Amino acid sequence: MEKSLHFYRDGLGLSTDGIVGKEFEHGAVAFFDLQAGLRLAIWKRDDIAHDTKLKKTAPSPTEFTIGHNVGSKEEVDEVMARAKKAGAAITVPPHDTFWGGYSGYFQDPDGHLWEVVWNPDWEI
């Protein structure tokens, strides 16, 4: 969790109070503010399995992506550069898409896949 905390807080600049809930068994979590009412929460996988009562399975980066929509091609480049500097693995460098947008993909320290994307039809 410390590596992910550092990545999201120090590398990507997301606001957080750090890791809280350490006093509880299976309770350690860090919340990052994304926008009003929307937060990213990071937990240890064992703790998620315990809390949800689901069997822990092998991680797969292709289960889902987290989309980070921005307002310009330049902003895609900036976010991707910040992620790389923070330790992300760039899986697809920023590029023009077949549908007229611009995007790139990276994996965070835990292997979660992010797409940073500009859609010319959306106002951000």
Please provide the spans of the model-predicted regions.
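Core segments of cupin and vicinal oxygen chelate
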Residues: 1-47
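A short, acidic/glycine-rich surface segment
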Residues: 25, 47-54, 123-124
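Vicinal oxygen chelate
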Residues: 30-34, 53-124
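Non-catalytic surface loops within mature trypsin-like serine protease
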Residues: 36, 46, 70-72, 108-110, ...
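Short hydrophobic-acidic sequence motifs that mark active-site Asp/Glu residues
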Residues: 39-41, 65, 113
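Short, charged, solvent-exposed linker or helix-capping segments at domain edges/interfaces
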Residues: 43, 52-54, 116
